[in-house]
Amino acid sequence: MPTRDAAETTPDDTLPWYVAPLPTRLEDLALRLAWVIAAINVAGTVFGFWYYRIQLADTPLAAWIFVPDSPMATLFIAASLVAYKLDWDADWLHALAFFGCLKLGLWTPFVQLVVNGQGALWWGMYWFLVLSHFGMAVEAFVVHRYATFSVPAVGVALAWYGINDLLDYFLGVLGGPHHTLLRAELGADAPHALYAHDIAAACAVALTMLATYLALATHIHATEHRR
């Protein structure tokens, strides 16, 4: 089965730095190691579902897909890289991967460092969560090398993560909360009334907006360059 490599994916030097902040050499390296990075993300997905096992046990089955946001993001990027290597037409998947890795890659470190703190969590696990999620944000900025971020594809990603935000922070349906439980929310009678919840919600919505802007900006700049 034919596959693609980094040499077939020419970087667009016209893109502004804020949509393509990584050095081209780093992008090329990531694309050459796409299979390895996809495998690492699959492993991260498995670990992530294990990490959420306690919260999932208390969540109705119908809402499970909305709870493990980070594992879903690593699953999206793994599938996106596989689709890239096999030259599949899956721009909607690439958009989901970009949104997920950027959003969760920045939301989790922010919440851990600013809202949660280490608490009783083992320091090794704490910093693993922070740094591994930063890595997700970095790999998000490789996706533009093979994605077009078409308007319909961005619409799919915006719908998915917009619905996630609504269910996680604003609509108490399906036996929530569905977001990653914050330390301040453990044992709380009304977790959505806490200030920590408001901060986490604001960060999530802002990052969904940021991902939408960056994806559409990438699409617009690339389209203008091709004219």
Question: For each predicted feature, which ranges?
Answer:
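Membrane-proximal helix-loop-helix units in multi-pass membrane proteins
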Residues: 97-163
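Alpha-helical transmembrane segments
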Residues: 30-45
